[in-house]
Swiss-Prot record:
NCBIfam families: PRK11190.1, YhgI_GntY. [4Fe-4S] cluster binds at residues 149, 152. The lineage of its organism: Bacteria, Pseudomonadati, Pseudomonadota, Gammaproteobacteria, Enterobacterales. Its cofactor is [4Fe-4S] cluster. It comes from the Bacteria. This is Fe/S biogenesis protein NfuA.
Length: 191
């Protein structure tokens, strides 16, 4: 469910050593399943453990997850990374904004999940997003770009070299990707 690397476990163990006896960590999602979902980690003293919590036991600590957050933390990873600029704790939760879709779900749902959980977070750095409009009977994914992607001079490269390659690799049943957007270059466009 959640991976906590050895480096992150060591970091947490040092922090927990200064807390009340028996204190562990809690991993949670605020506003799960929404575009504003945010993940967090906090201390979890023994008296804060709920009967409905799930306990994940690791070598150096336990992590508690509340019932509501659990499906949104599927495949999450917590790491403690050190580089030339210092150290930081990272929490990656690809399913926080929407639940992971079953491998047997309809193609439209699986493609939409990849767009929302993997593609749109990358496009968001430029203020952009992409929406799946339909999958045609001849297996073409019809997309519409918005935000900073609308009118961007690099949208064709993003579509063919980024999105299409990734979708065709993940979904061999797709034959291609097409852009439905009527691009209007303007102040909103990322150049």
């Amino acid at each position: 469910m959640i991976t906590i690397t050895d480096a992150a476990q060591s970091h947490f163990a040092k922090l927990l050593a200064n807390q009340e006896e028996g204190t562990q960590i809690r991993v949670f999602v605020i506003n799960p399943g929404t575009p504003t979902a945010e993940c967090g980690v906090s201390y979890c003293p023994p008296d804060a453990v709920e009967a409905t919590d799930t306990e994940l036991k690791f070598e150096q600590l336990s992590a508690y997850i509340d019932e509501l957050s659990k499906p949104y933390l599927e495949d999450a990873e917590i790491d403690f990374v050190t580089d030339q600029l210092g150290s930081q704790l990272t929490l990656k939760a690809p399913n926080a904004k929407m639940r992971k879709v079953d491998d047997n779900a309809p193609l439209m749902e699986r493609v939409e999940y990849v767009l929302q959980s993997q593609i749109n977070p990358q496009l968001a750095g430029h203020g952009g997003r992409v929406t799946l409009m339909e999958i045609t009977p001849d297996a073409l994914a019809i997309l519409q770009f918005g935000g900073g992607c609308n009118g961007c001079s690099m949208v064709d490269v993003t579509l063919k070299e980024g999105i299409e390659k990734e979708l065709l690799q993940k979904f061999p049943e797709l034959k291609g990707v097409r852009d439905l957007t009527e691009h209007q270059r303007g102040e909103h466009s990322y150049y």
